[in-house]
């Protein structure tokens, strides 16, 4: 092996190249690689954060849907309860109105009965007076009295 000037020249060129690469090319290259690695790490962190936020948002949506369903069911139950209460109130009002009408009809029937009795009493009194007049006008005769009483019975 001959160590000649070309080997030394190649070694000098290699060290100069190494020094140029180490001084001017390697730092920007390392910086670019570090920036790229940082961007990738930031992107992965952002993806993880986005994934966590998505899961949280999904939980919130599920919770909101559950609350909305529960609220809707509660509103339906309240509406049904109000409808039932209204129906019961209407039934009670109708029953009260029916009872009032029945009581009024009974009172009117009672009044008509009383009026009819009074009218019959008046008619009976008139007929009794007429009968007494006829009896007094005629002679006292048992057969005539019986006929008049039968005639009065027929008129009553």
UniProtKB/Swiss-Prot annotation:
Q: Which CDD domains does this UniProt record tie to the protein?
A: ATP-synt_Fo_b
Q: What terms describe the molecular function in GO for this protein?
A: proton-transporting ATP synthase activity, rotational mechanism; proton-transporting ATPase activity, rotational mechanism
Q: Where are the transmembrane segments?
A: 7-27
- Coiled coil region boundaries: none
Chief subcellular location: membrane
Keyword DNA repair listed? The answer is: no
Please give the GO cellular component terms listed in this UniProt entry: plasma membrane; proton-transporting ATP synthase complex
Membrane topology annotation: Single-pass membrane protein
Q: Where in the cell is it found?
A: Cell inner membrane
Query: InterPro entries from the xrefs?
Result: ATP_synth_B-like_membr_sf (IPR028987), ATP_synth_b/b'su_bac/chlpt (IPR002146), ATP_synth_F0_bsu_bac (IPR005864), ATP_synthase_B_chain (IPR050059)
Keyword set for this entry? ATP synthesis, Cell inner membrane, Cell membrane, CF(0), Hydrogen ion transport, Ion transport, Membrane, Transmembrane, Transmembrane helix, Transport
What does the UniProt record say this protein does? F(1)F(0) ATP synthase produces ATP from ADP in the presence of a proton or sodium gradient. F-type ATPases consist of two structural domains, F(1) containing the extramembraneous catalytic core and F(0) containing the membrane proton channel, linked together by a central stalk and a peripheral stalk. During catalysis, ATP synthesis in the catalytic domain of F(1) is coupled via a rotary mechanism of the central stalk subunits to proton translocation. Component of the F(0) channel, it forms part of the peripheral stalk, linking F(1) to F(0).
The similarity comment for this entry is: Belongs to the ATPase B chain family.
Quaternary structure note: F-type ATPases have 2 components, F(1) - the catalytic core - and F(0) - the membrane proton channel. F(1) has five subunits: alpha(3), beta(3), gamma(1), delta(1), epsilon(1). F(0) has three main subunits: a(1), b(2) and c(10-14). The alpha and beta chains form an alternating ring which encloses part of the gamma chain. F(1) is attached to F(0) by a central stalk formed by the gamma and epsilon chains, while a peripheral stalk is formed by the delta and b chains.
Instruction: Identify this protein by name.
Output: ATP synthase subunit b
